[in-house]
């Protein structure tokens, strides 16, 4: 019986890992469709390379930092319980690799390639798993203190804070240290529009992410006996709420329309196992509003050139999601209970503080040591030709 359960659980979490692996194609196409044509190849290569670096670093360092588990044992030992511990690593790796994928969208079109891979190694090896261990493995006694003080631990079922807010708040200092793209803002304060280069690819990326997100959220149960359809229903409602509010506030702009469902899904991750579907709908709708309002404000008023809006989308909507779990997760508002708003507030603030400080240190050190921005000539030429020596489409065909 145990063998059947182990096999079923291993398959369950493996399918989740594969769905989230596919989400990285979504990250790539969302960025490809948003950046200008001369930076499309770079978007594709960067996401793939970041995932490969994340895999190696998380295998040797990050997973041990978060969970105290290493894989330096014989294959026979590793294969026990149908290899469940191995596919659990694969599943959690796909979460860790989302950190550089999120950052990539913010620093697009002007960041150096190799320094970003170095940043990925440090962030996935140390910064991300440090907070992951606190939130999901009880490190430093923070969860025990919150439970003793406020009656419940910090609850983040699928990573509104641990993954999305951390990624978004690491990206913010990276974007600020890089500075705006060449020609984005004039000395007089005027804003030069850089519209998406390919709306169909942007939409494709958003759809891939949206579909994969149901693996991201539902499979966070990690075993079949803990799986609950409430998570899927709440994810669906948050997606719908985020879409409609972003569509309305964005005045039918397709960029806002297709980021709306992502905003809702980011926010519902933390409390998707606790909320009533109506609470999830409200959480997603508010997230859609946060994204549209803050994206416009950061770009036009504060002159922060966050290309894909990853700080509003992941950083702020993720922060809202951590807090929303402590609101709509309460039994008084139709939730399942077992959550404290104060624990959610303190846990969320701790997560974004660790992320922001870690981001400043990592990108600040790289900027001082080797530089993190392309030369003006390279930026003007585009990252595709400057870094990869090829464009996304041939300028001309050669016939013999």
Predicted regions: what is each one?
Residues 1-400:
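Hydrophobic alpha-helical transmembrane bundles of multi-pass membrane proteins
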């Amino acid at each position: 019986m145990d063998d059947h359960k182990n096999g079923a659980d291993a398959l369950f979490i493996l399918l989740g890992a594969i769905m989230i692996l596919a989400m990285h194609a979504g990250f790539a196409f969302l960025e490809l469709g948003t950046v200008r044509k001369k930076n499309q190849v770079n978007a594709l290569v960067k996401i793939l390379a970041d995932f490969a670096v994340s895999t190696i670093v998380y295998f040797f360092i990050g997973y041990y930092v978060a969970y105290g588990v290493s894989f330096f044992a014989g294959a026979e030992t590793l294969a026990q319980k149908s290899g469940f511990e191995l596919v659990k690593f694969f599943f959690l790796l796909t979460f860790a690799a989302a950190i550089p994928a999120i950052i990539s969208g913010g620093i697009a079109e002007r960041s150096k390639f190799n320094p970003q891979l170095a940043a990925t190694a440090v962030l996935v090896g140390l910064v991300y798993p440090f907070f992951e261990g606190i939130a999901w493995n009880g490190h430093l006694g923070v969860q025990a203190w919150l439970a003793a003080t406020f009656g419940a631990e910090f609850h983040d079922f699928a990573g509104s804070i641990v993954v999305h807010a951390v990624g978004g708040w690491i990206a913010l200092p990276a974007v600020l240290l890089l500075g705006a793209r060449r020609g984005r803002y004039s000395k007089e304060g005027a804003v030069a529009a850089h519209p998406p280069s390919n709306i169909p690819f942007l939409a494709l990326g958003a759809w891939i992410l949206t579909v994969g997100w149901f693996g991201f959220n539902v499979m966070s149960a990690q075993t079949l006996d803990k799986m609950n359809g409430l998570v899927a229903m709440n994810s669906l409602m948050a997606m719908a709420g985020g879409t409609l509010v972003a569509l309305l506030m964005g005045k039918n702009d397709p960029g806002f329309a297709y980021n709306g469902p992502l905003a809702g899904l980011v926010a519902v991750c933390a409390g998707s196992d606790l909320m009533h579907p109506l609470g999830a709908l409200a959480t997603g709708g508010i997230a859609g509003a946060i994204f549209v309002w803050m994206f416009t404000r950061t770009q036009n008023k504060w002159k922060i050139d966050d290309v894909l809006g990853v700080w509003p989308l992941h950083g702020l909507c993720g922060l809202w999601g951590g807090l929303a779990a402590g609101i709509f997760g309460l039994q008084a508002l139709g939730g399942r209970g077992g959550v404290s708003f104060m624990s959610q507030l303190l846990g969320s603030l701790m997560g974004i503080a660790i992320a922001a400080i870690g981001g400043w240190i990592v990108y600040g050190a790289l900027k001082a040591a080797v530089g993190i921005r392309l030369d003006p000539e390279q930026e003007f030429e585009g990252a595709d030709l400057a870094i990869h020596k090829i464009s996304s489409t041939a300028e001309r065909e050669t016939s013999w």
